């Protein structure tokens, strides 16, 4: 929300459970499920790095919200989509596929270091903070240059 993508990703990685289980030593320290969001990561003495209070659905929904809305920048409101990505500089190109009702959206992002431009189905050009009216059926291709 502060438009600091590298800091946002750093914080996201700190709370993402999979980041705490990449090597055996980290798994032994973390001690909780790598597929469940923890409410706490302890920082004191012999408990430093250990997860706690897992299986809280509120925590997982906030992580999902951070991923979708604030990092990938996808926000659906009243059947309209806005796209405002806040991704690290090293993410030069990436793709997202999502379904809305019976439609499938294929979104291709590309960082070019200029004003944001969105192209929908190769003909409709949307600039800055305009939204896209979502279709309920079919396939839709969106290209995001930012």
Q: Where are each of the predicted segments found?
A:
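Non-catalytic C-terminal accessory modules of carbohydrate-active enzymes
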Residues: 1-146
